[in-house]
Structure formats: structure tokens, C-alpha cells
Amino acid sequence: MFFSKMLIPTLKEAPSDADIVSVKLMVRSGMIRKLASGFYELLPLGLKVLRKVENIIRQEMNSAGGQEVIFPLVFPKALWLETDRWNAYGKELFKLKDRKDAEFCLAPTAEEVVTDLIRKDIKSYKQLPVMLYQFGTKFRDEIRPRFGVMRSREFLMKDAYSFHADEADLEKYYKTMFDAYTNICIKCGFQFRAVEAASGVIGGSFSHEFMVLTDTGEEEMTWCSCGYGANSAKTECLKIEQSKEEPLPSEEIFTTDVCAIEDVAKLLNLSPKKFIKTMIYIADKKPVAVLVRGDYEINEIKLQTLLGADGMLLADEQTVISVTNAPIGFAGPAGLKNIKIIADLSVAELSNALTGANKKDYHLKNVNFKRDYNADIVADIRKVKRGDTCPRCKKEELKFSRGIEIGHTFKLGDKYSKSMNASYLDANGKEKFIIMGCYGIGVTRILAAIIEQSHDDDGIIWTNNIAPFEVVIVPLNYADEKTKETTEKIYKELSSKGLDVLIDDRDERAGIKFKDADLIGIPYRITISEKNLANGNVELKARRDGKDDAVRLFKPEGVVIELLKIFKK
């Protein structure tokens, strides 16, 4: 392949709206171009990398017993009504109508369509288990698309679904898929962690996220050397042992217009750890009071999961006033009536705490659990914070890292099969719901994640198996007969052995060619100059070696042997 014949529009500078390294380098190297907010065109170089990532994933899916399928990009509303996700999915769901006014959505995920397929064709336990997977374009109307293909409105995803007769079989297969995802991450050259995660709108009883470690990652995770790991939304928080104090008489304190915990703490010279923060939420249209220690935040994902609520949001001021008889900022658990109270583990044993008094400009001092208030549920509903102890070993302090989620695996159970009536007959002729697993991986997101983790000041550093080309041959004067002859001979010998080779035949200065090779991230560069050829040599440089002083000289036949050895051809 000749550089001059390909569309590789490299740029010296990145666009001003490119916000992270991967976007800058993907645009500058000619991999992508922006069409509109959240929509990108994948150019030849980008597509070559994408196909190589696809093949890595496909090999692992096939090894796990998967069968590849293709689903439409447009799904009928009727299927989404069966699972109640037509409205629950929110504004991210692209909706459209055809000329007959029938409603559809652009595929954001494929649980409904694959369950519909299976319920039509799987009738007996003898047909189970089965796993289907596809590479398909997905659409999500992100409120603020950013970070290039990392969080776009259109993206390529591999989604897989497994179907089982019982939970035990799902558990066994989930481990198979967990291992497959681990292998994909290793083959892509990632430094990564698989961590426990919240299941979100997909649902199910348990899930893992596969997180690529990078400071630019949107997700925060916690981990411990004992092996525990979770994203911050899922991280378990322990009951806090707190010093017992003799309960003191409760006392109202006038705090003028001060209501923020930090301000009240300063006014009364108290630590926020002595406060009980009381927040009023609306869960499935009913108010609920939620309590957490003053130095913690409420984890809304944990809270919604605990309540089993379809929808949840903070109450508006009018609702807060009707529940507490006070404006926002003065709520407290003592005296609340006709409302469910949920207390975090951090407050249940807090002695002589300070709370709002349910009265404007007043707080209540020396509030104690069971004496002054009770809770309907005491559970872990707080966000993890630095300094918290690992919930698994209960010894070490949790460590925090940031990462990019590139894969997510779920144990769905019968969430979709029950709502869509996907059942089978067991060995005794009894009808049972099919048990499901779900396994997604963002293919275009993997490209960006690799670049975020593997780049330098000069450009991208691809691994050998993913690079758009494995070798670039740079003849400094392609018009010279001997240079051209040597270039084409090396090209033919390497190509015949299966290597992906690019000849940079452009009439450009050597410096421009070298900069583009480094920018694109081609692992090995062969430079052919008249000067070196006069001595029977060509130059070989590995992209990962960095500076040009890492250049090695070889005979033309020797450089072929060396590269075939490196690539094990």
C-alpha cells in the first residue's frame, strides 16, 4: 500500500475543540473527522485499527462458544413497552416514526430484540445454553457528547447475550465470558482492572466493568491489594464504629439563616462528623427521608436499588416544606411523620448528633437514634470517600483510581425473559423462564482508550497486533532506481509473509515523513537512503524506542529476517 494512494489527512495541529489526547491524535493522524456533535467519520486508518480490534473480540467470542448475528438498527416501540424501557430509558433514546406513524427507536442496546428472537425459537432445555453476539452501531442521544468517540452519540459496540436453563449454568458461563474479556484487554495491551459495578438501566443482579487505567477516565474506581475492586458508585461502605457518649437532653439552637453543614459547623465549632444530613427524595412519586453523616454524600444509585424504585429525584422546596414544615436546609429526622426514613450505617450509632429542627433558622442538638427518631431501614446508602476501609478485608484503606469503562458484563437473571415471557420446558415438562447474561464492549471506545494509555509527545504508540500498519518503509528518494528497487523488494517479502506494510512514497522531506510515521504510531520504520544503500544497509527503528539514536542498521535481507522474527512470521 502506498501512502500517496491512501486518504491519510494528517494535521500539524489539533482542532480547538479536541478536549483530550485521544481526540487530538485521532484527528491529527487522519483516523477520524467530526461530522456533527457526537458523530464522527471513520477514515481508512481508523477503520483498519477498528477491524483489528473487532477480530480480537470475535476470536474470543467464538472461543467462548458464541454465534455471530446481525440485528437491525431500528427497533419497534412495542418491544420496548414490554420491558417498560420505552420511557424509563429517558431522553438518550432516539425515537422516530415511519410514514404510517408507527414508532421506533434507534438501537442503544439490544436486550429486547434478542429476547424476542429467542422466545420465538427456543422451546426446550435441550436447546440451551446458547450465546449470540453482534457488532452493531448504537445510538444514544447524549446530553453533552464529548471526548470524541469516547462519549459520542453513534458508536460501534459488540453486544453478546447468553441464555441458560438456570442460575448455576449462567454462573459458570459468566466466568467464561469474564475470562474472555480479560483476554481481550490483555491482547489490546491495556493496563486494566475488572471491578464490581452498578447495573444501571440494563438491570440484573450483578455486573463487572472492565476499566482501562488512565487519569483522563470519566469513571472513578476503588480497589484494595486483597483483590477487591468496584466502581465508586458500587463500592460497599462499612458500619462505622463510633465512640459511645451518654445521651444528653436534646436542645433547639437558633442558627439564623445558616443552613449549609459547613457554615453551621463553623458557627457552632463542631465537626461535620457530628451532623446528620437529612435529604428528602421522591421515589416512585412518594417522599422518603434519607439520613447520612454530615461528612458523607448520599449514593443515589445505592438508594434507588435499595428502594427498588423505577424513578427517583430530590424533592422540590414545596415538597420539603410540606414534609418538614421548614424550608430546605433545616430538615431533621426527629418529629417526622408519615414518611419512610432510610438511615445510612454512618448515622445509626452516632451519639448526640446535630440535625435540622424542622423549623426555619433552628437546628436540634444531642439527637440520638431510637430515642429521638427511628428508621424504617438502616443500610449502606453513602458514597465512598478517601480514607474509607476496604469492605472485603476490613483492614486496608481503599485506593482510588480513574479509568475508562470499555466493557461491562451482567448477570441479568430473568429480568427480560419474565417481562417478555421467554420460557422453555425443562426435563420434567415444566415451563420456566430463561436465565440471561449480557456482555457489552465498546469497540470504537477501545481505540480511544488505547491511545489515552499509550502515546507520547510525537503521537500514538500502537501495539503490533492493532496498528493500522505494522511496518512503514520510508524511501528518502523514491525516484532513485536502487532506492525504489530495494523498497519494493522489502515490501514484497514482508507482505508475502502476512505483514501489513505501508510505503511512504510521497515527494516530501524526510522530517515530514518521520513525523507522520510517529504520529500515526506505526510500530517499525525502515528508512532507505542512498547514503546507507551505498554501504549495503537500511535503517530500522522501533516506534516505542523513541528518539532517533535507537536506529539500527541492517542489510536489506537482514531487516526482513529481523522483522519476521519480531512478528513471529
Swiss-Prot record:
UniProt keyword list: Aminoacyl-tRNA synthetase, ATP-binding, Cytoplasm, Ligase, Nucleotide-binding, Protein biosynthesis
Family: Belongs to the class-II aminoacyl-tRNA synthetase family. ProS type 1 subfamily.
GO molecular function annotation: aminoacyl-tRNA deacylase activity; ATP binding; proline-tRNA ligase activity
Subcellular location(s) of the protein: Cytoplasm
Stated role: Catalyzes the attachment of proline to tRNA(Pro) in a two-step reaction: proline is first activated by ATP to form Pro-AMP and then transferred to the acceptor end of tRNA(Pro). As ProRS can inadvertently accommodate and process non-cognate amino acids such as alanine and cysteine, to avoid such errors it has two additional distinct editing activities against alanine. One activity is designated as 'pretransfer' editing and involves the tRNA(Pro)-independent hydrolysis of activated Ala-AMP.
Record-listed E.C. numbers: 6.1.1.15
Oligomeric and partner information: Homodimer.
Highest taxon above the source species: Bacteria
Protein name: Proline--tRNA ligase
EC top class, as a word: ligase
Domain comment in the entry: Consists of three domains: the N-terminal catalytic domain, the editing domain and the C-terminal anticodon-binding domain.
Record field: catalytic activity: tRNA(Pro) + L-proline + ATP = L-prolyl-tRNA(Pro) + AMP + diphosphate
One annotated GO biological process: prolyl-tRNA aminoacylation
Lineage of producing organism: Bacteria, Pseudomonadati, Elusimicrobiota, Endomicrobiia, Endomicrobiales
GO cellular component: cytosol
Family annotation (HAMAP family): Pro_tRNA_synth_type1
